[in-house]
């Protein structure tokens, strides 16, 4: 449906674009270095069925981030992407207990879901001076899932 497409693209891609554009404008105007991290998904790198708008939005976000990294590098503004795999949340916890959820878990090499805490260290790397030479990069945090079939 077109309405679903618009909602997903507006939320996942356009929303990130607007925030990153405003952040970069402010940093450039202040002549200040900085770091922008966009949150994509492994579904922006590999696809699966039934979520094509989401896959397109996240793939677009990865490519937008790479282009923005090129545009902003001369201002010492880094732009990177964090691409989580399947992360357990309150919203999806019940699904992972179903047969379908258990089958999906078997395709993750570590045989477990990620936890929100698993994203903290990679995010800190991208935001801090520890990652000062990283720009245009995507860090995938997925228990090896991207190496396997999705």
Give, region by region, the residue ranges found by the protein language model.
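A conserved structural motif in NAD(P)-dependent oxidoreductases
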Residues: 108-119
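Alpha-helical segment proximal to the catalytic Tyr-Lys
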Residues: 25, 70-74, 132
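Residue(s) in the substrate-gating loop at a strand-loop-helix junction
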Residues: 41
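Short C-terminal tail/terminal secondary-structure segment
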Residues: 46, 124, 135-150
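Substrate-binding pocket helix/loop in short-chain dehydrogenase/reductase
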Residues: 1-9, 104
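Active-site loop-to-helix junction immediately N-terminal to the catalytic Tyr of the SDR YXXXK motif
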Residues: 47-55, 67
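Active-site helix of classical SDR
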Residues: 20, 57, 65
């Amino acid at each position: 449906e077109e309405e679903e497409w618009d909602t997903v693209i507006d939320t996942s891609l356009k929303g990130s674009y607007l925030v990153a554009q405003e952040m970069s404008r402010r940093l450039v105007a202040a002549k200040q270095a900085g770091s922008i991290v966009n949150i994509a998904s492994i579904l922006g790198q590999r696809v699966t069925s039934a979520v094509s708008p989401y896959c397109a939005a996240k793939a677009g976000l990865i490519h937008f981030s790479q282009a923005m990294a090129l545009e902003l590098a001369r201002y010492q503004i880094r732009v990177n992407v964090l691409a989580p795999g399947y992360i357990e949340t309150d919203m999806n916890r019940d699904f992972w207990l179903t047969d379908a959820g258990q089958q999906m878990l078997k395709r993750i090499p570590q045989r477990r879901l990620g936890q929100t805490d698993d994203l903290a260290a990679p995010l800190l790397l991208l935001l801090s001076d520890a990652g000062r030479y990283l720009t245009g990069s995507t860090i995938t945090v997925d228990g090896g899932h991207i190496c396997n079939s999705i």
